[in-house]
């Protein structure tokens, strides 16, 4: 198994799909990485040489923020919003939708399950 950015990527998949297993790399970014490293998009990870894997690893390290660093940056951004007390930070703190979605009937996932008492069965 090839290890890129601290993630074991699957060997039987195409390189473009395998790169999407890394947090912060989607399909379009994976295509851009392959173009930047001069690697065919359809080649499987098994068929990559060690030199090509090292090229991909270095390209990602130099040009993109992925995995732990990206998670840390996102959490720091959310913490900043909550610290300055803006509306978005307030919504994050309360666990409600941040981007203006309605909450009267929807947003069950974000709000969580309600703690309603369940009626006992009649005997």
Curated annotation (Swiss-Prot):
<comment type="similarity">
    <text>Belongs to the universal ribosomal protein uS13 family.</text>
</comment>
<keyword id="KW-0687">Ribonucleoprotein</keyword>
<dbReference type="InterPro" id="IPR018269">
    <property type="entry name" value="Ribosomal_uS13_CS"/>
</dbReference>
<comment type="subunit">
    <text>Part of the 30S ribosomal subunit. Forms a loose heterodimer with protein S19. Forms two bridges to the 50S subunit in the 70S ribosome.</text>
</comment>
<dbReference type="GO" id="GO:0015935">
    <property type="term" value="C:small ribosomal subunit"/>
</dbReference>
<feature type="region of interest" description="Disordered">
    <location>
        <begin position="97"/>
        <end position="123"/>
    </location>
</feature>
<dbReference type="GO" id="GO:0003735">
    <property type="term" value="F:structural constituent of ribosome"/>
</dbReference>
<dbReference type="GO" id="GO:0005829">
    <property type="term" value="C:cytosol"/>
</dbReference>
<keyword id="KW-0689">Ribosomal protein</keyword>
<protein>
    <recommendedName>
        <fullName>Small ribosomal subunit protein uS13</fullName>
    </recommendedName>
</protein>
<keyword id="KW-0694">RNA-binding</keyword>
<dbReference type="GO" id="GO:0000049">
    <property type="term" value="F:tRNA binding"/>
</dbReference>
<dbReference type="InterPro" id="IPR027437">
    <property type="entry name" value="Rbsml_uS13_C"/>
</dbReference>
<dbReference type="InterPro" id="IPR010979">
    <property type="entry name" value="Ribosomal_uS13-like_H2TH"/>
</dbReference>
<dbReference type="GO" id="GO:0019843">
    <property type="term" value="F:rRNA binding"/>
</dbReference>
<dbReference type="InterPro" id="IPR001892">
    <property type="entry name" value="Ribosomal_uS13"/>
</dbReference>
<keyword id="KW-0699">rRNA-binding</keyword>
<dbReference type="GO" id="GO:0006412">
    <property type="term" value="P:translation"/>
</dbReference>
<keyword id="KW-0820">tRNA-binding</keyword>
<dbReference type="Pfam" id="PF00416">
    <property type="entry name" value="Ribosomal_S13"/>
</dbReference>
<comment type="function">
    <text>Located at the top of the head of the 30S subunit, it contacts several helices of the 16S rRNA. In the 70S ribosome it contacts the 23S rRNA (bridge B1a) and protein L5 of the 50S subunit (bridge B1b), connecting the 2 subunits; these bridges are implicated in subunit movement. Contacts the tRNAs in the A and P-sites.</text>
</comment>
<dbReference type="InterPro" id="IPR019980">
    <property type="entry name" value="Ribosomal_uS13_bac-type"/>
</dbReference>
């Amino acid at each position: 198994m090839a290890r890129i950015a601290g993630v074991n990527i699957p060997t039987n998949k195409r390189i473009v799909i395998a790169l999407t297993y890394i947090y912060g790399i989607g399909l379009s970014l994976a295509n851009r990485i392959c173009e930047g490293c001069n690697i065919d998009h359809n080649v499987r990870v098994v068929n990559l040489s060690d030199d090509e894997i090292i090229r991909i690893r270095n390209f990602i390290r130099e040009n993109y923020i992925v995995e732990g660093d990206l998670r840390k940056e996102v959490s720091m951004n959310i913490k900043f919003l909550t610290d300055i007390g803006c509306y978005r930070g307030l919504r994050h703190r309360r666990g409600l939708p941040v981007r203006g979605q309605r909450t009267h009937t929807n947003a069950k996932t974000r709000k969580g399950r309600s703690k309603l008492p369940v009626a006992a069965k009649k005997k």
